[in-house]
Amino acid sequence: MRTQVTLGKEELELLDRAAKASGASRSELIRRAIHRAYGTGSKQERLAALDHSRGSWRGRDFTGTEYVDAIRGDLNERLARLGLA
């Protein structure tokens, strides 16, 4: 089935970066995201995903606190631009 979805510039840029990094199409990434968000993946699939993410912070030159602060800063800037802060 085919459907049409309107994305903002930021969402499209995120999707394009993920597509380039993974080699998957936009459509495939959207299908995967829908499956993760709304699907009924098995316990084994969820555990495999957790196992796959192990060590993802290895080699980073910043702490978790610094990362969260940076994200919050970006969020606050976006909210201010939208007049929501």
Swiss-Prot record:
It comes from the Bacteria. The keyword Transmembrane does not apply. Pfam families: RHH_1 (PF01402). GO terms for biological process: positive regulation of growth; regulation of DNA-templated transcription. Keywords: Toxin-antitoxin system. The keyword GTP-binding does not apply. Antitoxin component of a type II toxin-antitoxin (TA) system. Upon expression in M.smegmatis neutralizes the effect of cognate toxin VapC19. This is Putative antitoxin VapB19. The gene is vapB19.
